[in-house]
């Protein structure tokens, strides 16, 4: 194999945006932030959690309404 062509593979901290839990893994990235981890995921906890997607849906509807009004 050729020398010095592969990216650096180091220890990084993965941080959950939902619960704040941190854990270490190895990656070529400097840090990783995830939306949901196994500590707070509904499958592992047995609790149902509603993820706020209303903002995305409303934004899509607004863009779609604007696009359909312009095409008429």
Curated annotation (Swiss-Prot):
Domain of life of the native organism: Bacteria
This protein's record includes keyword RNA-binding: yes
Keyword field contains Cell inner membrane: no
An example Gene Ontology molecular-function term: structural constituent of ribosome
Keywords: Ribonucleoprotein, Ribosomal protein, RNA-binding, rRNA-binding
GO CC list: ribonucleoprotein complex; ribosome
InterPro entries reported in the protein's UniProt record: Ribosomal_bL28/bL31-like_sf (IPR034704), Ribosomal_bL31 (IPR002150), Ribosomal_bL31_A (IPR027491), Ribosomal_bL31_sf (IPR042105)
Leader sequence residues: none
PROSITE patterns linked to this entry: RIBOSOMAL_L31
GO biological process: translation
UniProt function note: Binds the 23S rRNA.
Quaternary context: Part of the 50S ribosomal subunit.
Family from the record: Belongs to the bacterial ribosomal protein bL31 family. Type A subfamily.
Protein name: Large ribosomal subunit protein bL31
Species for this entry: Prosthecochloris aestuarii (strain DSM 271 / SK 413)
């Amino acid at each position: 194999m050729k020398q010095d062509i592969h990216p650096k593979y180091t220890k990084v901290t993965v941080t959950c945006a939902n619960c704040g839990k941190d854990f270490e893994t190895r990656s070529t990235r400097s840090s990783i932030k995830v939306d949901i981890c196994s500590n707070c995921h509904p499958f592992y906890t047995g609790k149902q959690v509603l993820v706020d997607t209303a903002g995305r849906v409303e934004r899509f509807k607004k863009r779609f309404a604007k696009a359909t009004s312009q095409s008429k």
